[in-house]
Amino acid sequence: MKRPHLVHFSAILNEDFLSIRAGMTMKENPIPHGGVYYNLAQELAQSIEKEIFSPRFPIASIRLLKGKTYQMKIVAMANGLEVYRKIFESDSHGNFNFKIPLNDERKNINALSVFEVSLTPGLELLLGSYIPLVLSRPSKLIICDFDKTLVDTKYSTTKEVYFSLTKPLEYFPTVTRSVAILRSFIKKGFHPFIVSASPHFYEEAIRDWLYQRKIFTAGIFLKDYRQVFSLFEMDLTPKDLKLHGLYKLNHLLDILLMSGIPNDIVLMGDNFEADPVIYLALVSFLLEHQDPRTYWQKLKRLKAFQMNHKQDAQLLSKFYQLNNIRQKNHNQQITAKIYIRRKLQEESIEIPDVLKKFASVIELYDGNAELLNASVKEESQVQRAE
């Protein structure tokens, strides 16, 4: 039997809005066999334990290539009282992204109940209850890449792609230096977000990998490959399968539009692709007051950002939204830092002239990858020998 399932759900409460981002799909709902309540509970507990502690293969979530429209009912509670109730409709891929404006009652929201209400007329299916992440001042965010930054993944050949889909992420070397940097900022009160070029169906596998290392993120933002092949919602096009500038900058803007502009922001990435340019594009806009249109006209000519007219308009619109937030808090001081894992042994990186003014916020570091699991290391050595 299948029932709707939340792939991810993020709720962030700041001074002005409750921002919600969610993804929904259909998933098999196994029913334990047995006639005794104890046995049922025991089987269910074993099922949950397996779900939590067994690393999942990315290919196991390939079902997420399918899309469907859903309706989500949100019931918000504040101090035990219901203060908000509304039904929202997803896009054709089951994604939700919306904001709930706050008033005196809603600013104290501390619990959310989530239902799917469209699949069976008259039936509301409870998908879960959630506590929103409350961002108070001063706010601190750390946004980290995943591939080549936290895990030394490889997708260069067909064999490597197949291997990445059919093995847990544990089978790839961990970049221990990157994990240490990320953890150090989390201990200082920074809220972590993950932004990666991995396909959207890697989300459960990535979350497993992070949770095993006690890294609990405020949100995981991946590239939704369904948009590339959609006939209607083409936020991404075939060129974006290999180019990451558009989607990554888009997700960075989404995070700040959900959370508000932080007092301290740290960005982590690598020098294997365009992370330094993408991160500097955001940081320079935050640190220097500029007209969004004039600023974007300079940036979109860079090689890292190649887009069609629709994508151009969408990004410009988000820059204007971010600018409105910045103007509202025009006296706010912002501190920014960018950590970039070296590709080789380079002492500096190439930065476009339009962004060189802010190059000093970048710190390069060596990220030697290590296979922490001995059995995994042996298997990797055998594969190299073959």
Where do the model's predicted regions map?
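Short, acidic loop-to-helix structural element flanking the phosphoryl-transfer center
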Residues: K167-P192, H200-E204
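C-terminal cap/substrate-recognition subdomain and adjoining C-terminal extension
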Residues: P199-E386
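A short acidic-Thr-Gly-centered motif at the start of a beta-strand
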Residues: P132-S136, L256-S259
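A metal-dependent, Asp-based hydrolase signature
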Residues: L64-T69, S156, F163-S164, Y202-Q212
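Short, small/polar residue-rich loop motifs at catalytic or cofactor-binding pockets
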Residues: V83, S136-P138
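Asp-based phosphoryl-transfer active-site loop
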Residues: K140-Y155
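A solvent-exposed, charged loop/short amphipathic helix patch at secondary-structure junctions
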Residues: N39-P55, T157-E170, D235, F285-M307
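Intrinsically disordered, serine/threonine/proline
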Residues: M1-I131, H191, Q332, K356-E386
